[in-house]
């Protein structure tokens, strides 16, 4: 009887172990892809304006978002979000938390099979909203297509007030794109695969609960090189001319 049970449960155990390891590998690969996409997009000076990137509290990268196999026009993507550490978001870029993006067929109007998205989270309310639960862009957090190029100073009031600025790249074409109506949420299962334990997304992204995993080093190093300091928190010393 014991031998029979062994023959029944041993294959199931081996299969479950394989599935778990395979999922972990996929999540590691996705983190590495986030780093590749970030490097390709952020290292082009005329794409995302430097002043906006410097003001961003967090950055989210969704690589290769595709049309879902279900639903008319539905799309689904998975990626990673990293935030500047510290109470005022003025520290180093921290360990990423895995995220999921769900919505309509955004970005596919030009016939692309897959679209890369980069989202800038511009304030702490936007960051806390996204990390806390499932957020509908445009309703739970204000969102707008991000301005492109060196002339970002000409951005509209809508863009200036937005908590989330979004950009897309498909077939080599880069542009600001509105993701209003889509949802963003923490991917808790993927976080467990990456970090080996169940830990809230907010603890990872905002409170330094985890170290940067090797698969995320390219993403973090790209951001460190492109925007190492939070511009709005830099202090300057001025000469007050304190003569006698």
Where would I find each of the regions flagged by the language model?
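Positively charged n-region of N-terminal signal peptides that target proteins for export
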Residues: 1-6
């Amino acid at each position: 009887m014991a031998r029979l049970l062994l023959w029944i449960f041993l294959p199931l155990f081996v299969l479950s172990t394989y599935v778990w390891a395979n999922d972990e590998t996929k999540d590691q690969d996705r983190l590495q892809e986030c780093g590749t996409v970030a490097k390709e997009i952020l290292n082009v000076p005329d794409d995302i304006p430097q002043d906006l990137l410097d003001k961003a509290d967090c950055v989210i990268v969704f690589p290769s978002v595709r049309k879902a196999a279900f639903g008319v026009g539905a799309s689904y993507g998975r990626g990673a979000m990293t935030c500047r550490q510290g109470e005022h978001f003025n520290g180093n870029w921290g360990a990423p938390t895995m995220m999921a993006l769900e919505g309509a067929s955004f970005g596919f109007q030009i016939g692309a099979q897959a679209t890369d998205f980069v989202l800038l989270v511009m304030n702490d309310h936007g960051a806390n909203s996204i990390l806390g639960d499932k957020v509908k862009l445009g309703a739970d957090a204000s969102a707008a297509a991000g301005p492109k190029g060196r002339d970002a100073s000409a951005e509209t009031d809508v863009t200036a007030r937005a908590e989330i600025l979004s950009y897309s790249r498909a077939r080599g074409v880069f542009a600001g794109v509105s993701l209003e109506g889509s949802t963003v949420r923490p991917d808790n299962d993927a976080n467990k695969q990456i970090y080996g334990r169940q830990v809230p997304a907010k603890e990872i992204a905002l409170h330094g609960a985890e170290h940067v995993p090797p698969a995320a080093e390219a993403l973090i190093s790209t951001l460190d090189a492109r925007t190492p300091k939070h511009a709005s928190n830099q202090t300057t010393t001025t000469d007050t001319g304190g003569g006698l």
